[in-house]
Amino acid sequence: MGDRMLPAALRLAGGRAPILVPVPLTRARLRERGFNQADLLARALSRRTGWPTDCLLRRERGGPALARLGRRERARVAERAYSVNPDLPRALALHPEVLIVDDVVTTGATGVACAEALGTAGVECLGIVSFARTNPLAEPS
């Protein structure tokens, strides 16, 4: 799986060695599923690149699952769904840039929200890399 994301990750990194930051799940969702698919993808990509992976973001509990929402609602909910992990300064000592890793990009709201949360903490986000991208149906009017 890391092979599929490798070209985009290398292009976005531009010769740097960023921290791979998986999009987090809520604790409830992680317990239900038993794994975080974005974390598995980040680890696979890390094995191919040698870049570190670290869970620098937290998904705040509450709110609906983004996968079930339309474009506008996704953006509204995602805007306040992510926060920075308190371990952030220590993790960034050697690798000041990050790449966000997600399984699927639908509207881009999750990636933007994660990048904004990291940006407010002074982290340079080089981009988001995902395993797949969907082509969402138009929202009903």
Region locations from a protein language model:
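Conserved PRPP/pyrophosphate-binding segment of the phosphoribosyltransferase/PRPP-pathway fold
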Residues: 1-100, 107-141
